[in-house]
Amino acid sequence: MKARALVAWNVRRIRVDRGIPQEQLAYDAGIDRSYMSGLERQAENPTIDLLDRIAGTLDVHLSELFVQPPKGATTPKPLPKGRKPARPRRKKK
């Protein structure tokens, strides 16, 4: 599996395992939700700094984003749809 695919698979797996909506992870990492979606679909090529920020937001070591999935592992299922929580407002600088 290529690096971009590993990162995509692991970010999604960790996020879904912890019940974190994609929008919330993107907000907490300081990136746009559409970019996070692209990252999970292997459409984006994130920098090492961004991967470090995402790993920190997920509270895992950066190396966890490059772990090979077990043989026969399937793509994590999406979180159940439902009402989205209100997004917190960003503080003005």
Range-by-range predicted roles:
Residues 17, 28, 39, 57:
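Residues within the alpha-helical elements of helix-turn-helix
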Residues 67-93:
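Short, charged recognition helix plus adjacent turn
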Residues 11, 22, 33, 48-51:
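Helix-turn-helix DNA-binding elements, focusing on the entry/boundary residues of the two helices
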Residues 9-25:
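Short basic helix-loop element that most often maps to the first helix and adjoining turn
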Residues 50-55, 65-66:
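Hydrophobic micro-packing sites on short alpha-helices
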Residues 11, 25-26, 36-39, 65:
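Conserved hydrophobic/aromatic packing and binding residues within compact polymer-binding modules
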Residues 30-45:
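Recognition helix of helix-turn-helix/homeodomain-like DNA-binding domains
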